[in-house]
């Protein structure tokens, strides 16, 4: 604009100068004409100055408007970019939430199981006309399949369901092959809730794994025995313990006088563990009482498994002659021989109930190595003796002494793991039956196992 005004002023000056020169030359212009031209020039200059001022103001306004527009455009671009980012983040979050929802239940559930294939040989003696003779050898093959589900209900509550072959036998989940390839039964092996009510404290409700500590390879309890009822466990620092109450039989209004004759087990175990010899040593004492067992029949399949019984009249029902108030003590010492773990153990039990003659059981043994990781092995041996009424026999190991009390003898064990979760095991029992009562009989049992875990 300033260049235009300057050009106009110069043009006007030149015009005025030319007019004045022409007037002097021609001598015809009057003084009034010159003044008129000067007045017009002054007016023109004033108008030009006003136009220049107006133009400058317009330029300033335009600059401000342009700056504001640029700012608005920048803000719009920023908002658009933020919107895109939020949409992308929202899409990612939605996808992650979807994944979490889809896998949340899976993270709280664990599946486990194992499968065992066994070849078994049993050789025993028998009485024939009051003389001892060899019974026919028995060969059979058996399978065991177990499957479990552990679900975290809350941070301190876990629910477990487990199923196993073997029918309803409380001491065995083995299924003998045969029956012309019939389908084999599968039963509820465990169903319980584990509530961690405090640090080191748990309550188990339902059909649960045996919570009693068993030293070493002791066979006072069968490994398949899963009691039913309540257990409260404590394990903190060097101290541990378990109080338990288990159902045996529920016999509503079965007594002749109209009273109930429900048989139960109640007991308490306490122990401590501490470091010794480069390993851990565990000492424990356990006491249980079989309530309403004497004179009753808390027996699976009416089989006392060696405990003393009697019958009434012509009844074929076996009734327990004695009560069972059993105290147990056990010790287990863990150490190492070179790089191999070594476990030494011993346990002792006695039935404190009245008038029991054969009331003592004991065992001791060792285990060297551990067949767990690839190319690892284990071996062990122990001796065990169980008097006829030393323990309540319904949960006694089902293999030692043909699954009965009134037996003693040795057990040899060996195992090898070619790879992890796969082991080959051999166990040999050479026992004596009827060590307290009747005629002694030799009993041999060989088990060859292939075990898979998953």
Q: Which residue ranges define each predicted feature?
A:
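Envelope-exposed proteins and targeting segments
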Residues: 107-109, 143-145, 189, 228, ...
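C-terminal functional modules
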Residues: 370-372, 385-389, 394-454
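Signature for the C-terminal beta-barrel architecture of outer-membrane proteins
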Residues: 197-203, 211-372, 376-379, 383, ...
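Surface-exposed loop and membrane-interface regions of Gram-negative outer-membrane beta-barrel proteins
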Residues: 118-144, 150-199, 211-222, 254-256, ...
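Short amphipathic alpha-helices and their capping/turn segments at secondary-structure boundaries
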Residues: 97-107, 148-150, 270-274
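N-terminal periplasmic/intermembrane-space "pro-region" immediately following the signal or transit peptide
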Residues: 2-132, 454
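Residue-level detector of buried hydrophobic side-chain packing
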Residues: 44, 48-51, 147, 193, ...
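Soluble periplasmic/extracytoplasmic beta-strand elements of cell-envelope proteins
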Residues: 110-114, 148, 160, 192, ...
């Amino acid at each position: 604009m300033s260049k235009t005004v300057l050009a106009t002023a110069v043009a006007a000056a030149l015009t005025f100068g030319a007019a004045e020169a022409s007037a002097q030359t021609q001598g015809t212009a009057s003084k009034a004409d010159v003044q008129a031209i000067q007045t017009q020039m002054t007016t023109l200059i004033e108008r030009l100055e006003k136009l220049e001022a107006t133009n400058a103001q317009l330029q300033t306004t335009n600059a401000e408007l342009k700056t504001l527009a640029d700012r608005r455009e920048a803000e719009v671009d920023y908002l658009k970019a933020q919107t895109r980012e939020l949409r992308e983040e929202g899409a990612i979050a939605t996808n992650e939430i979807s994944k979490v929802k889809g896998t949340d239940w899976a993270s709280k559930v664990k599946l486990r199981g194992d499968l065992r294939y066994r070849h078994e040989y049993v050789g025993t003696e028998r009485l024939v006309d009051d003389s001892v003779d060899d019974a026919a050898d028995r060969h059979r093959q058996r399978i065991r399949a177990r499957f479990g589900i552990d679900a975290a209900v809350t941070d301190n509550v876990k629910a477990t369901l487990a199923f196993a072959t073997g029918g309803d036998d409380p001491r065995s989940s083995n299924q003998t092959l045969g029956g012309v390839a019939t389908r084999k039964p599968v039963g509820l092996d465990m169903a319980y809730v584990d509530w961690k009510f405090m640090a080191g404290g748990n309550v188990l409700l339902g059909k649960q794994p045996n919570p009693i500590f068993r030293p070493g390879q002791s066979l006072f309890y069968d490994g398949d025995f899963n009691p039913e009822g309540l257990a409260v466990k404590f394990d903190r620092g060097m101290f541990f313990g378990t109080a338990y109450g288990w159902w045996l039989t529920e016999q509503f209004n079965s007594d002749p006088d109209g009273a109930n004759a429900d048989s139960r087990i109640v007991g308490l175990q306490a122990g401590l563990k501490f470091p010794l010899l480069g390993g851990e040593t565990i000492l424990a004492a356990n006491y249980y009482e079989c309530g309403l067992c004497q004179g009753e029949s808390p027996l699976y399949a009416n089989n006392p498994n060696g405990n003393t019984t009697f019958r009434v009249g012509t009844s074929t029902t076996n009734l327990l002659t004695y009560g069972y108030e059993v105290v147990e003590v056990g010790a287990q010492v863990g150490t190492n021989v070179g790089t191999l773990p070594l476990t030494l153990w011993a346990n002792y039990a006695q039935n404190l109930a009245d008038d029991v003659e054969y009331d003592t059981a004991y065992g001791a043994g060792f285990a060297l190595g551990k067949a767990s990781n690839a190319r690892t092995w284990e071996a062990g041996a122990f001796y065990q003796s169980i008097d006829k009424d030393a323990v309540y026999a319904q949960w006694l190991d089902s293999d030692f002494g043909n699954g009965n009390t009134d037996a003693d003898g040795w057990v040899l064990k060996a195992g090898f793991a070619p790879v992890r979760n796969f082991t080959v095991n051999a166990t040999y029992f050479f026992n004596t039956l009827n060590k307290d009562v009747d005629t002694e009989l030799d009993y041999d049992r060989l088990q060859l196992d292939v075990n898979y875990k998953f």
